[in-house]
Amino acid sequence: MEVRRNTFPKEEHLYGQTAVDMLFRKGKSFLAFPVKVTYLVTTDELPVRCMVVAPKKKFKHAVDRNRVKRQLREAYRKNKFGLQDWAVSHEQQLHFSMVYVGDRLMPSNVVERKIKVALEKLLEKLG
């Protein structure tokens, strides 16, 4: 039996100008407040790659942006297995981003609950 670890290693981070540009140019998006999710089914070596964004326009202080990004990463890390299972079973690769669009800080448990809903909505859209 394979043990699943709740980690978010660097290989699962979506970065690099070409990958990010392609995601925002060709990807589809939806709003699941407080995040806007943009996703793209692609050809890549890893099943799922994710990027989190906290815009400077909404949060002027770096400490607030860092808190939001930490909350988003933590919520994704705990709830990522549904997406990974979908990608493996459909033999697809998925790139997606979560952009925090709320203008207020929220407690971590609320953010996690909302991210869980956003990830379920993403799975629903993927089919």
For the regions a language model picked out, list residue spans one by one.
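Positively charged, solvent-exposed patches that mediate nucleic-acid binding
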Residues: 1-127
